[in-house]
A protein has these predicted regions:
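Short hydrophobic beta-strand that contains or immediately precedes a catalytic carboxylate
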Residues: 6-8, 99-100, 246, 459-463, ...
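Conserved "right-hand" nucleotidyltransferase catalytic core of DNA-directed polymerases
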Residues: 1-10, 15-17, 27-30, 34-41, ...
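Function-dense linear segments that define catalytic or interfacial modules
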Residues: 417-502
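Catalytic palm subdomain of template-directed nucleic-acid polymerases
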Residues: 108-112, 166, 200-224, 472, ...
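Active-site-proximal helix-loop-helix substrate-binding element of RNase H-like nuclease domains
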Residues: 28-33, 37-177, 495-500, 506
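Polymerase palm active-site segment centered on the conserved acidic dipeptide of motif C
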Residues: 213-250, 538-548, 637-683
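Short active-site loop/helix that positions an aromatic residue
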Residues: 13, 82-93, 105-110, 252-261, ...
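Conserved catalytic core of nucleic-acid polymerases
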Residues: 196, 203, 301-324, 330-333, ...
Length: 683
């Protein structure tokens, strides 16, 4: 028995307090129940490890036989291999060979057109026999644990999954070699190879300092309480006695823009994103009202009680209470004053229209805060800053603090699952919690809760410098961009200079938000006039990138897709030419190649660094990857050797890229690295 083995496992699961399933082996009550395999010669096997119907707890023979199969396996086929691998490893099995993940390969074949990737959904699309049996579904709905489901029924289901996965793998391999999809072969190999490393990172975990986490939580909560007190006073100054819930986008909109729609149900329909400014302003005026500050008085109709007692026909007062509609049961009436409430901002265009009024999202408030700063509207600037900070703190507490508290396992590690199939471009995603959403840089306090697993160890973070810009310079073969990269030209200072010269004083730090935005399809639309001048100048400055953007549009119209140098494909089946010559979906058409090429570089580097560290017999381990960075838990006294390993990977990248994709990436790639006692204090 040897060759390709298709494998599926069944395990028990637990739930968090919020009802989210915990599928991993690091949760104490979770158990491996059953492993089913199928060989290419048709041989099927079932290995039981835990079930309420088992007559013995001795699983040594099952372990021996399964390990024999794994030892003779040349390729392990799974649907969602990370899950299978960590369960095998945690149960004591060894497998370090190649894998073929049918879920990931199907994801790549979707070419950015997302469809569900569960085995059941994929099997249905491929018309394979893999429907969960009715009795099994019913037992799961009743709340039975996997190890309580009828043993024969569970085995039938697991074997059905294995058969479907094997058949799916054969279909996917055949598709790989078709003319239409052949460009994906190299990226499929990279994706499957990386999957094993990401499972390893998941299994290793990232050590969490619980004391530091409590300290950060206390600091966030204290700051939040102070903000709420400040905002309570600011809201009173802005709107008077009107009760305001700042968590309501509708009420926040009325404060920021000092207007309220007449009818929310028809509000959005009054606007078109292509309407002229004069028509937009008129539509706002005709369909919304100015909001005024109010003074609260006791309702005269109910004497401030919020209700009236029922008066009988004979004039006597009954016990029944009737809601006072004058005050809406509050006992208070709010009398409008002559002073307009709120900050009195005007939305610049129909793009700012929202269901509740006008946009109050993060970007909109950030832009308005910038406007307030330039106009020296200090009160508005402070209010908007406080609102944005309050929103950020709420996110930090709910997503990061609570997430880390919930998902840190008994081994005091957060096991970071990096998913390859969640984003359109292949960029890694994570959840439980989503560490990819952490603010960039080394000032975010949450990062200091992540430490080395060794008492004197350090955390090293290696980060690519301006990776997306370098990818775009290569893709557009832009001479000027390449020259700026090679000479170390300060592009952020240049951006600040352009915007400042256009009449809006801008710091280098503020300019960073704009420098590379055009690479991802952003335009000057919705920006200030001075900021828009930079976006216009970007196109004329980087002629190679601009020309490449035009070529992409032509490619999409000719073939319905974009193919990157690494072979990734992105389909745009419904792309159309616009009357003015552009195409629909142009933002995505420009964005996907840059982001996906950057992603492939990072993923190739992850494998290089890991392989180099293993060849050097280092104990240090990769524990995370966020955006364009690699995070390494560094064993004491190995810091310099790890840095040397990173330098070696940087030097090898061009040659490895050429060997892997037959593409000469002729733009220098730079990995900057920092180290510290925790993830935040890396310098």
């Amino acid at each position: 028995m040897a060759g390709i083995t298709t494998l599926d496992i069944e395990n028990t699961t637990a739930k968090t307090e919020t009802g989210k399933l915990l599928l991993d082996p690091f949760t104490p009550d979770n158990k491996l129940v059953l492993v089913c395999t199928k060989q290419d010669d048709g041989t099927e096997s079932s290995f039981w490890f835990h079930h309420t119907e088992m007559e013995t707890n001795d699983t040594s023979e099952a372990k021996r036989l399964l390990q024999e199969q794994l030892d003779q396996t040349t390729v392990l086929v799974c649907h969602n291999a990370q899950h299978e691998l960590i369960w095998l490893w945690d149960t004591g099995f060894e497998y370090t060979g190649p894998i073929f993940d049918t879920m990931l390969v199907e994801y790549l074949f979707q070419r950015g057109q997302k469809s569900p990737l569960s085995l059941e959904a994929v099997a249905e699309r491929w018309e394979l026999d893999n429907q969960k049996m009715g009795t099994l579904k019913e037992q799961l709905r009743k709340g039975l644990s996997v190890d309580q489901i009828d043993k024969d029924e569970l085995e039938k289901y697991c074997l059905a999954d294995v058969r479907a996965t094997q058949e799916l793998a054969r279909g996917l391999r055949k598709k790989m070699f078709s003319t239409e999809y052949s460009s994906l072969q190299n990226i499929i190999e990279l994706t499957n190879t990386l999957c094993v490393l990401l499972a390893t990172i998941y299994y290793r975990g990232f050590s969490v300092d619980k004391d530091a986490l409590r300290q950060v939580k206390d600091e966030f909560q204290k700051e939040r309480q102070g903000l709420l007190m400040s905002l309570e006073k600011q809201v009173y100054d802005l709107v008077g006695d009107t009760p305001i819930n700042l968590a309501s986008p509708e009420q926040l909109s009325s404060i920021v823009y000092s207007r309220k729609p007449h009818d929310k149900s028809t509000w959005v329909g009054n606007f078109s994103k292509y309407m002229k400014k004069v028509d937009f302003d008129l539509a706002v005026k005709n369909n919304s009202s100015v909001v005024y500050k109010t003074t609260a008085i006791s309702c005269q109709d109910c004497q401030g009680k919020g209700y009236n007692l029922y008066v009988k026909k004979d004039g006597t007062v009954g016990k029944a209470k009737r809601i006072c509609h004058t005050c809406n049961h509050t006992g208070i009436v709010y009398i409008p004053q002559k002073k307009i409430a709120g900050l009195k901002f005007s939305a610049p265009s129909a793009n700012w229209v929202a269901n509740h009024g006008f946009s109050t999202n993060k970007l909109s408030l950030e832009l308005l805060e910038s406007v307030a700063r330039r106009r020296e509207m200090s009160y508005a600037e402070e209010f908007l800053h406080n609102i944005r900070r309050l929103s950020a703190l709420d996110t930090y507490l709910s997503s990061f603090v609570e997430g880390i508290e919930t998902y840190t396992k008994p081994d005091q590690k957060l096991h970071v699952r990096l998913a390859q199939h969640r984003t359109t471009t292949g960029r890694l995603a994570s959840d439980s919690p989503n560490l990819q959403n952490m603010p960039r840089g080394n000032t975010f306090p949450i990062k200091k809760v992540f430490r080395s697993r060794w008492p004197s160890g350090k955390i090293i973070e290696a980060d690519f410098a301006q990776l997306e810009f370098r990818a775009a310079a290569f893709l557009g073969n832009d001479t000027l961009a390449k020259n700026e990269i090679e000479t170390g030209f300060d592009v952020h200072s240049y951006t600040a200079e352009v915007i400042t010269n256009a009449g809006q004083k801008t710091t280098r730090q503020e300019a960073k938000a704009h420098t590379f935005a055009p690479l991802f399809g952003a335009t000057g639309y919705g920006r200030t006039q001075a900021e828009a001048s930079y976006y216009k100048q970007f196109t004329s400055k980087y002629e190679g990138i601009a020309s490449w953007h035009k070529d992409l549009a032509d490619e999409v119209m000719a073939t319905g897709k974009v193919t990157t140098p690494t072979g990734r494909q992105f389909a745009f089946p419904d792309a159309k030419r616009r009357p003015q010559g552009g195409i629909t979906h142009f933002t995505a058409v420009k964005n996907y190649p840059v982001q996906s090429l950057s992603t492939d570089i990072v993923q190739l580097t992850l494998l290089l660094v890991e392989n180099n560290m293993r060849k050097a017999y280092l104990q240090s381990v990769i524990v995370n990857s966020v955006h364009d960075s690699i995070v390494i838990d560094t064993y004491p006294e190995e810091e310099e050797r790890v840095k040397e390993t990173i330098n070696n990977a940087e030097q090898q990248l061009r040659e490895v890229f050429l060997q892997k994709f037959e593409v000469d990436f002729d733009v220098p790639l730079v990995l900057d690295f920092k180290s510290g006692i925790n993830w935040m204090n890396v310098v």
